[in-house]
């Protein structure tokens, strides 16, 4: 198999799930769980090691709420089914996973993504040359606005929002530019029983017009002097969704795209929405990731939100993003 192209999405998901269900392979074995000192500049934490036929994964949680770093695997190499299944399990358990020091040119980035889902094109920003599914996420030295600079889950204004997103760092500032992530399982579970009962029956309206989270250098160049409006998208989704793989319930609104509740005005919706927006990003639900060139993050849009911090004015930051097709939230 060509490692640049990777396996097709059926092999990446359906075949692995079939093998797991049939008991044709197990996801390695737990070797140790220990407290260890990470490398320079990295947090200390409990390291969990999974040993498999071809790889030994060292898993280090980034916080008590969300996120884990995975060491011991070269993502540019062809991944066997056991390793893919192990990575997917850590991803489902921790909602966002991080890898460092990865050499992933565009073809190999797409090949990696296809192990976990079907890459899709982003509706507002043109992909890089030759790879329409890879979105450039760029902030130049002179620019003041960053891409997606607020808490959100990607493109919830679509009828079928992406289930996951991969982001790899190509150029990073000398400091700043970290990304925050938040656990929407915890955001739902920490609400009172009465409020959970109320939210379980509500539907939210999500719109691409609420916040200009797609304003990038390319957008500004394209829109300068033009009168034609960009298309707007709107979708209805349950305020609380059930994760199709874990079965857990997660709060599924976000400050970037959710504008109101169905059958309510924005004014009527605002008090409860504003409370929930503040609640779902409480510090105890979050982690913070510092990027280096070659770092890759892979997050689950169905149960996590993210917020790229815009604190590196005067420096250049270049990332490549791949989103994976999802289903309609239920």
Task: For each feature predicted by the language model, list its residue ranges.
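Short terminal hydrophobic/aromatic SLiMs and anchors at protein ends
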Residues: 2, 9, 17-21, 25, ...
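Residue-level detector of transmembrane insertion/anchoring sites
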Residues: 5-10, 14, 142
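Periodic, rod-like helical contexts
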Residues: 13-16, 30
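Residues in and immediately flanking transmembrane alpha helices
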Residues: 15-18, 37, 165, 313
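Compositionally biased, low-complexity flexible segments
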Residues: 33-43
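Non-heme Fe(II) oxygenase catalytic core, chiefly the N-lobe of the double-stranded beta-helix
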Residues: 49-296, 301-330
